[in-house]
Amino acid sequence: MYFYETHTDDLYSYVAPAPTPSRLNISFFVSRGYAVFSPDIHYTKGNPGKDAYEYVVSAAQDLAKKRFIDGKNMAIQGQSWGGYQVCQLITMTNIFKAAWAGAPVANMTSAYGGIRWGTGLNRQFQYEKTQSRIGANLWERTDLYMQNSPLFHLPKNKTPLVIMHNDNDGAVPWYQGIEMYTGMRRLGQKVWMLNYNGEEHNLIQRKNRKDIQIREQQFFDWLLKGEKPAK
């Protein structure tokens, strides 16, 4: 499953099977025998994690009833806001056998006071008013910031995760990926982190786009198809 917010408008758009900057290469994975589902997610104020759970997990549960779907071997992938939701979801359900998160926010309390390196904009607006939709500042609703931060719920996670977060990311500080990675390592959970030196929020160099596609294929083939893990 691949998600961000809503993808219905792209339902009939052609997706070229070329290496992508970070998004799931839907055409490529379908050509390898995977079924890829991209649910729409709609949000309410203060509950982005819960809303993602209700849309994504309910979709997964319904898909698992289909005879052409292997309900025991499902995975999730997302980038940026989608990556955040991947990290949050694996602390809320064990239905997915593997997960891949690009440039995720792991801790809204530490990300709240930062800036976007590319523009210098303070990040507070994002959490209060726009994409994160918390609807209050950090001190008014500390509980919601913690409730919607994967880092604080990591002991519940059972899902192997790959994180891609690059050291020149101007949108989401890469220390967010580091917090998720070191937290899972501290708890003895299965996690890997990719950092393409000098790359931004989305991969620019074609060689890196090709590399991440190979690694993503190897990861999902290993955990979902039972193939040998990459060395």
Name each model-derived stretch.
Residues 1-6, 12-231:
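Active-site-proximal cap/loop segments of hydrolase catalytic domains
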